[in-house]
């Protein structure tokens, strides 16, 4: 009989994809289990179906969660655990705990609202009722289970485990989690911020570890490293170019951190009279509440330059849904709305009313996951489908990639080098395959003897002091089809252009033959 390793790690999310972060650490036979993060899968509808499927673990086995930060792809399944009867605790930094109150309650409202909208759609008539993944009440229950701990101080998340949180430089309250158990020393990066990021100090961490689990979101990208002043120059140019067209500048934003960074830069430009004095609308109740948390932790932030982002005369925080809808009738404004990947939230109705307007501009300032509506728009789709409606894309589409909260390839590599020696394995997670492979190739070139693991969803690895990780179970083959390109977005794009394509076929008989040919293909595919 093969001896059971003293510690194992199972990847329930963010393996070969950038969302759904969730790692389960289990001590040997009869030992305790903990999770590092428990996040929501985001992006395409196909990928999001994983949130409703099997968790891959029994919540009753989990003694605690160590949470790296408050982004939904790292904490968004915690309310589902609460709905299943789990009670905590959730260990995190104080700013993260403060943010969870709003992040998870909002996530619950989104789940409830999304279920209501789906059940009302005409194309679901006769289908089984769609139930929300969890509710606002479940989200608040998860927040109440938070147990804040200071950075750089050891604590015991569960019997047999010792942990310490290090600054990750990603967003307010973000941390990397150092964990010791069964003689194994492990560091989970969480999300690592870029060097010299606005608001946040640079990432830190220990060295001389058995295992390092490192994110690889931008493992295949190296950005030009620019100063905050240069970034503001770029934003100034985009704002001026958008407003001179006479339309709105619509910016899909992540409610947490990206909104606050943009506000600081916009206010700075306005105070210096570098941009026109137009109204700035933050149309996201969650972003408004997160901004108040930032203000409460202002003494922990850098680069504020005395700006109070929670109270500034040029910034209008939109709370009421009716006020949000009224923004569809205006022009010449800056509208910031969540969600950042355009998969939910008020940004969808702003896109619906502005994508079709040639005078409008949509400016992307954040990562767009494969399959997300934001990625589809960025890749040049002439039409998109939003809430069951076909929308032609006539607006000017722009992108600034200097606001990233993620380290690029060179910064990730530098962070990994600073953790040396890594005596067991470097484990690359939280990335799409191209990013993982590029970062792995770079690190392998620097150290040919380094064990590098690229886990798949559902895989379990045995961990032992000083030894390379050993795969114990293979990944979940039932979910591989959810990864990568999404058929539902292809369908939406196809449906949006179908009528136009048919209209270009000469003659009614020819169009009818084309329709019949499509029907035959569909019938044959069904077997």
Which residues does each predicted region cover?
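Active-site neighborhood of phospho(di)ester-bond hydrolases with catalytic His/Asp-centered motifs
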Residues: 37-38, 62-71, 78, 90-93, ...
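Short active-site oxyanion
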Residues: 63-64, 87-89, 248, 278-279, ...
């Amino acid at each position: 009989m093969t001896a059971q390793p003293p510690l194992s790690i199972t990847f329930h999310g963010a393996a070969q994809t950038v969302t759904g972060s969730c790692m389960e650490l289990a001590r040997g036979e009869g030992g305790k289990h903990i999770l590092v993060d428990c996040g929501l899968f985001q992006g395409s509808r196909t990928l999001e179906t994983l949130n409703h499927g099997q968790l891959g673990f029994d919540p009753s086995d989990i003694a605690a969660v160590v949470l790296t930060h408050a982004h939904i792809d790292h904490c968004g399944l915690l309310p589902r655990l609460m709905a299943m009867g789990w009670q905590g605790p959730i260990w995190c930094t104080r700013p993260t705990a403060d943010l969870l109150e709003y992040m998870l309650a909002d996530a619950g409202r989104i789940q409830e609202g999304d279920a209501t909208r789906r059940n009302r759609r005409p194309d679901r008539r006769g289908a089984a009722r769609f139930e929300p993944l969890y509710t606002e009440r479940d989200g608040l229950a998860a927040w109440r289970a938070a147990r804040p701990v200071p950075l750089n101080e050891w604590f015991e998340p569960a019997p047999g485990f010792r942990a310490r949180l290090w600054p990750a430089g990603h967003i307010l309250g973000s941390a990397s989690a150092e964990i010791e158990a069964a003689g194994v020393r492990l560091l989970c990066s969480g999300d690592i911020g870029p060097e010299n990021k606005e608001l946040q100090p640079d990432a830190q961490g220990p060295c001389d570890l058995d295992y390092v689990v490192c994110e690889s979101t931008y493992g295949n990208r190296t950005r030009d490293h620019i100063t905050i002043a240069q970034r503001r120059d770029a934003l100034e140019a985009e704002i001026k170019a958008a407003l001179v067209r006479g339309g709105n500048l619509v910016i899909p934003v992540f409610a947490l951190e990206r909104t606050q960074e943009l506000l600081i830069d916009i206010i700075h430009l306005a105070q210096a009279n570098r941009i026109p004095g137009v109204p700035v609308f933050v149309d996201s109740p969650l972003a408004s509440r997160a901004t108040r948390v930032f203000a409460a932790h202002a003494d922990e932030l850098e680069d504020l330059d005395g700006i109070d982002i929670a109270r500034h005369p040029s910034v209008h925080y939109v709370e009421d849904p009716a006020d949000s809808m009224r923004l569809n009738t205006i022009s010449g404004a800056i509208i910031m709305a969540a969600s950042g990947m355009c998969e939910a939230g008020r940004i969808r109705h702003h896109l619906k009313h502005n994508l079709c307007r040639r005078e409008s501009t949509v400016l992307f300032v954040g990562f767009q996951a494969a399959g997300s509506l934001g990625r589809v728009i960025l890749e040049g789709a002439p039409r998109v489908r939003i809430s069951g409606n076909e929308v032609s894309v006539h607006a000017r589409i722009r992108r600034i990639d200097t606001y990233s909260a993620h380290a690029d390839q060179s910064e990730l590599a530098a962070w990994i080098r600073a953790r040396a020696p890594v005596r067991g394995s470097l484990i690359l997670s939280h990335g799409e395959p191209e990013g993982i492979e590029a970062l792995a190739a770079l690190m392998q070139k620097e150290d040919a003897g380094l064990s590098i693991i690229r886990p798949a969803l559902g895989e379990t690895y045995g961990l032992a002091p000083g030894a390379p990780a050993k795969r114990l179970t293979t990944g979940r083959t039932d979910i591989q089809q959810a990864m990568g390109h999404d058929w539902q977005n292809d369908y939406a794009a196809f449906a949006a252009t179908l009528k136009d394509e048919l209209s270009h076929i000469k003659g009614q008989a020819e169009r009818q033959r084309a329709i019949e040919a499509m029907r035959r293909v569909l019938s044959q595919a069904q077997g």
